[in-house]
Amino acid sequence: CCAIRLCNVYLCGSCCP
């Protein structure tokens, strides 16, 4: 999803705008 691995599929929306 995002380049940050800490960002899960669920957190992808808030991690990557």
Swiss-Prot record:
S-S pairs: 1-16, 2-12, 7-15
GO cellular component labels: extracellular region
Post-translational modification 4-hydroxyproline, affected residues: 17
Keyword S-adenosyl-L-methionine found: no
Record's keyword terms, sorted: Disulfide bond, Hydroxylation, Secreted, Toxin
Tissues in which the protein is found: Expressed by the venom duct.
First-listed, main subcellular location of the protein, grouped into a coarse class: secreted
GO MF entries: toxin activity
Subcellular localization, as worded in the UniProt entry: Secreted
Keyword Glycosyltransferase belongs to the record: no
Description of its domains: The cysteine framework is III (CC-C-C-CC).
The family this protein is said to belong to: Belongs to the conotoxin M superfamily.
Name of the molecule in the record: Conotoxin reg3i
Originating species: Conus regius (Crown cone)
Lineage: Eukaryota, Metazoa, Spiralia, Lophotrochozoa, Mollusca
